[in-house]
C-alpha cells in the first residue's frame, strides 16, 4: 500500500465523516441517489433533499414507477435538472434491462443513463466490494495539489493522467475507506478556497503546500464571458392562483412547471388573450437575472391580471394556487418571481 493511501485511510478512520445518511447503507439505489445529488452540490444542501426523496420514493421500483412530475417536484431547488431526468430514466432502465436489480459490474453500471465512470466505480466500490478508482471534483483537487499536476483537470490529457494516477494509488485492501477518505478530505480540508493544510494527513508530501500553490492548483478552466439572454414570462394571475405550463423534456428546466414564455416579438396582452384569457390589466414586474453554467438569463416577468381560463388543460396549461408554490416542481428563478406576488 502506498504511503498516500495509508495516510488517507488512517485519517479517515479517526477524522473522516461517518454519520452521513448514505454511509449507513450498501443499498445501491441509495448510494447511487446520493452520488447523483452530490454532483456539483454540497452535502448540507443535499441531505434534506436526499431524506425527503427517500421518504416519498424509498426503493428503485418506486422511483421507476413514479410520474415524472413527482420526481421533478422532489428535485426542485437542487438545480442541474438533467440529473433528475436521467435519474428517472436510469431507474426505469434498471427495471427494464436488469429486472429491477442494480448491476454489479462497473461497466454495466456506467452504461445506464446519467452515470459516468467515476460514479459507476463509486457505486461498485461501496456496494459490491469492487476495486476501482474514482475521480470526482474532490479527488481531482486532492491529486492535483498533492502531486503538483498542472493544467485544467477537465482537459482530456490532464484527466487521462489523473485517472492513471488514481489507479496506481489504489490500495489492495480497505478500498471503501480509501475512496471515502479522498472524498472527505476534499470536502472538509482540501477545499477549493482556504484549504486547512495544517490538519491535512498529506501535508508532508503535498507539492502545492510545499511550493505555496494551494490557491493556484488545480488550475481553473479558462474563463469566457457568459453569453447574455433575455426571456419574457407571463404571470397570468386570477386571484390567488397563477397559470403555468410544463416545459418540454429537453432544454433548460426540462420537465418542470414554469410560467408561459412569451414568443419573441409577441405582445403580452395579445398572447394572453390567445391562451383564452380575458385580460383585465398588464404590468411589468422587476427583472431577475439567473446564471446558468453556460449563459446568463434575464427574466422579464409581465403580470397579467385575468379572469379564469375555462379550458387550461386543453392547451397544455394548468392553474397553481399561490399557496402551493413552495412544493411545486418549479425552477428556482420562477419560484422567486412568484414569491414576490
Predicted regions and their residues:
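Intrinsically disordered, low-complexity, charged terminal extensions of DNA damage-control enzymes
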Residues: 1-18, 23-24, 187-341
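Catalytic cores of DNA base-excision repair glycosylases
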Residues: 2-215, 226-228, 277-278
Amino acid at each position: 500500500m502506498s504511503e498516500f493511501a495509508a495516510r488517507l485511510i488512517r485519517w479517515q478512520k479517526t477524522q473522516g465523516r461517518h454519520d452521513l445518511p448514505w454511509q449507513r447503507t450498501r443499498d445501491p439505489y441509495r448510494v447511487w441517489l446520493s452520488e447523483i445529488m452530490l454532483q456539483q452540490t454540497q452535502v448540507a444542501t443535499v441531505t434534506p433533499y436526499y431524506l425527503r426523496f427517500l421518504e416519498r420514493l424509498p426503493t428503485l421500483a418506486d422511483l421507476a414507477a413514479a410520474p415524472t412530475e413527482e420526481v421533478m417536484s422532489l428535485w426542485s431547488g437542487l438545480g442541474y435538472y438533467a440529473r433528475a431526468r436521467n435519474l428517472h430514466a436510469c431507474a426505469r432502465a434498471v427495471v427494464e434491462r436488469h429486472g429491477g436489480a442494480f448491476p454489479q459490474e462497473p461497466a454495466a453500471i456506467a452504461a445506464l443513463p446519467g452515470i459516468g465512470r467515476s460514479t459507476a466505480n463509486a457505486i461498485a466500490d461501496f456496494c459490491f466490494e469492487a476495486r476501482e478508482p474514482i475521480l470526482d471534483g474532490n479527488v481531482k483537487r486532492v491529486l492535483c495539489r498533492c502531486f503538483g499536476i498542472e493544467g485544467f483537470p477537465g482537459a482530456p490529457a490532464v484527466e487521462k493522467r489523473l485517472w492513471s494516477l488514481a489507479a496506481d494509488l489504489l490500495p489492495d485492501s480497505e478500498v471503501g475507506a480509501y475512496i471515502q477518505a479522498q472524498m472527505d478530505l476534499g470536502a472538509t480540508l482540501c477545499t477549493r478556497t482556504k484549504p486547512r493544510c495544517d490538519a491535512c494527513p498529506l501535508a508532508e508530501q503535498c507539492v502545492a503546500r510545499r511550493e505555496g500553490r494551494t490557491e493556484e492548483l488545480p488550475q481553473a478552466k479558462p474563463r469566457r464571458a457568459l453569453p447574455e439572454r433575455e426571456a419574457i414570462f407571463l404571470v397570468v394571475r386570477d386571484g390567488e392562483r397563477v397559470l403555468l405550463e410544463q416545459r418540454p423534456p429537453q432544454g433548460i428546466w426540462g420537465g418542470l412547471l414554469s410560467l408561459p414564455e412569451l414568443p419573441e416579438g409577441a405582445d403580452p396582452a395579445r398572447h394572453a388573450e390567445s391562451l383564452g384569457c380575458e385580460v383585465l390589466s398588464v404590468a411589468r414586474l422587476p427583472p431577475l437575472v439567473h446564471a446558468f453554467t453556460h449563459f446568463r438569463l434575464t427574466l422579464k416577468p409581465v403580470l397579467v391580471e385575468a379572469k379564469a381560463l375555462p379550458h387550461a388543460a386543453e392547451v397544455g396549461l394548468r392553474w397553481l394556487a399561490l399557496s402551493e408554490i413552495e412544493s411545486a416542481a418549479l425552477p428556482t428563478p420562477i419560484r422567486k418571481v412568484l414569491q414576490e406576488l
